[in-house]
Amino acid sequence: MFYALWAKIFGASTDSLRILTLIISLITWQLVYYLFGLFTQKKYHALLLSTLVITNPYFFGTSVFVFTDMLTIMLSLAAIISFMKNKTILFIIFAALAILCRQYAVIIPISVSLYSLLNYKNDKQISRNNFIGSLLTFLPLLLLFGIWNNISPASGIEKWIIPNSSFYNVDYINTYITFSVIYIFPLVIVFFKKIKLIYKNILIAMGFTFLLSFFPFNLLISILEFTDYKTVGFVHQVFVELLGYESLWLKIVLAFFLWVGCYIKIELLKRFYQHIKTKSFDTKLIFTLMWILFLLIMPISYQVWEKYLTMILPFFILSIYLLLYPNHKIIQEVRN
């Protein structure tokens, strides 16, 4: 709708729409740096983390080509920043628009609503406002469901949804855990330098890696039929070309990154549990909640693609950073 409005005013040419995309991208880059600046201990940390996001090939690509991904990221960042600043009305607007751009943005209001329930006893008024606001963000999407008489337009269902196909694709979890750590590998190196490896967590991560290996990367029939894609994205394609499709070396490399991702998730979940146990609910928990919900909700999607990580990576990066560099003073000041 936003692009359609721009096209009516300034024309629907590719150049015109690309200018809009570049404007959105510049705003998004600023929002990424601003969000990191709220939580990082030093300014150059925010700059380095922002660079990690911006240099992602998909982030850069969607900044140039005409897709709605960058608009979704911009609105998602604006929604979370509004939540951090207790700007409930702005949060409702930005979150609702993000959901209209990409339905998987529902992780934003769901995360906020869950956080509000956890934090209700500590701050009843703000938690109540955030919870109600989160529910309101779904109204525009529900309206579209009513117009479509389904969860998507008939044309989309006919093209992308295959009868008798799996409703929940566990292999998506494998995909997103594996490639999430590859795209932020410099931070992963810092992570393993700063933490102390725990033998029990190593074994648990190996167990999850073993279980998820039974659900290898797999493109849906609809993707194979309607596109030329044979891999789940850029990095997967590079690995396939270097190591060979379905080769033993490819499986070993991907299994290693899956284990790395599982280990990081275990550390995040452990810290998350400690906060719940001690009833210490600060706003940084929202980033871990978003990552968990992303992994749980995306398997419902009709396709899997590395590009979809672009929206969640800024929040995933922050969840890891705040695990390594707890900074409670700044986090408390964010809402003031």
Label each PLM-derived region with a short phrase:
Residues 31, 52-55, 62, 71-94, ...:
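Specific aromatic-rich, kink-prone transmembrane helix
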Residues 111, 115, 125-238:
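Membrane-lumen/periplasm interface segments of specific transmembrane helices
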